[in-house]
Amino acid sequence: MKKILALLLAITMIAAFCACAQKPADTTPADTSADTASDAPAASDGKLIKVGIINNDPNESGYRTANDKDLKAMFTEENGYDASFAYSLKNDEQIAAAQKFIQDEVDYLLISAAGTSGWDSVLQDAQAAGIQVILFDRTIDADESLYVASIVSDMAKEGQTAVDWLASQGLDSYNIIHIQGVMGSAAQIGRTGALDAQVAANDNWNMVTQQTAEWNAETAQQIVQSVIDSGKEFNVIYAENDDMAKGAVAALDKANISHGVGKDVIVMGFDCNKWALEELLAGNWNYDGQCNPFQASYIDAIIKDLENGKTPAEKTIIMDEKGFDASTITQEDVDNYGI
C-alpha cells in the first residue's frame, strides 16, 4: 500500500512540474521589468535601437571631447542602443558617413554638422528610408521638415553676449585680433557675426586681423605672433574657442605682453573648459562664453517619446548658456560649469 501511495505521489509531482514548465511567458510577474523597460528606450520588437552618430573630431577641442564622452555614456547597449560613431571636420566626409548609415538602415541619425550647408539631399534620403534625424550641438541650413528635432546652442546669442560684455568695458578704442574657428560652422558664423556687426557700427572698433585657426591652439599662436612681429597695436584677443585663446596667450607670454584683468590685453574665449575658467579665476583671462556640450539626455528623451508614438514637445531645444567675467567668477562657477 505504501508503495502504491508513493508511486501516486511521484506521478502527481511530475504532472505539476510539467504544468509549471508549460506556463505562458506573459503570465510571469512583469511589474519590475516593465518599469526598467520604460527607463531604457528598447525598440518595439525588443531589439536594440540602431543609432548612427555623426560628430566633429573629439580632438577638435575640450568642448568636443566632453560632447563625445556624453554621447558615448548615453548611447550604450545597457541603455537600449546599438550606436555607431563617425567623425570628421569636413562636411563632405560627414555627408558620406550619413549615406553609409542610411545604407546600414539605422533607426535614428544624429548629426552635429561641420558646416551649415549641403545637407538637404542626404536628409531627404534619410526621410525616404524612414530614418528619423535629430540635430545636436549645431544648426544647419535645411527645411525643418527634414529633421524631427534639434538640440543646439544659440551661437549667435553666444557671440552677442560676448560682444555686449566687451562693449561694457568702455575702452577708448578696441583694436581686436579676431581668431575664428572652422569657417562655415554654426559656431564660427554665430560668434563672428556679432563681432563683425559691432565693428561695422562703431568707428572706435578696429579689426587688426581676422583669421581662422580652425580651433587649433598652435595656429592661433602663430596668428598672434605674426601681429606682434608686425608692430601693430592691439588690446583685445577675441578667440572663438578656449584652445585658440590658449594659443594666443602663449604668444603674448613669449613677447612679455601682459594680459587679463587690469592688464594690456583683454583675452576672450568660448566653451568654458575647466582650465579656462581657472584662468579667469586667476585673472589671466577676462571672459569665457559657455557652450553646453551635454545634449545626450535630451536626445535620449526625444527618442523615448518617438518610440512610444509621441511627438516631441519641442521641435528645437536651445541649451541654457551664459558668459563668465573674471571680475565676478567664483570657484563654485568653475566647479559647476567647467567641462
Question: Where are the model-predicted features located?
Answer:
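Short, low-complexity disordered leader/linker segments with a strong preference
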Residues: 1-50, 76-77, 124-131, 331, ...
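Hinge/cleft segment of the Venus flytrap/periplasmic-binding protein
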Residues: 40, 47-49, 179, 183-187, ...
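Hydrophobic alpha-helical segments within soluble ligand-binding/sensing domains
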Residues: 45, 51, 94, 150-176, ...
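Extracytoplasmic "Venus flytrap"
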Residues: 50-70, 74-78, 84-100, 112-117, ...
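Short, solvent-exposed amphipathic alpha-helices that sit
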Residues: 62-81, 158-162, 186-205, 223, ...
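Short beta-strand elements at the ligand-binding edges of bilobed clamshell
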Residues: 85-87, 142-165, 178-180, 210, ...
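Hydrophobic alpha-helical
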Residues: 95, 102-128, 195, 213-278
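Flexible loop/hinge segments that line or gate small-molecule binding clefts
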Residues: 117-157, 273-281, 327
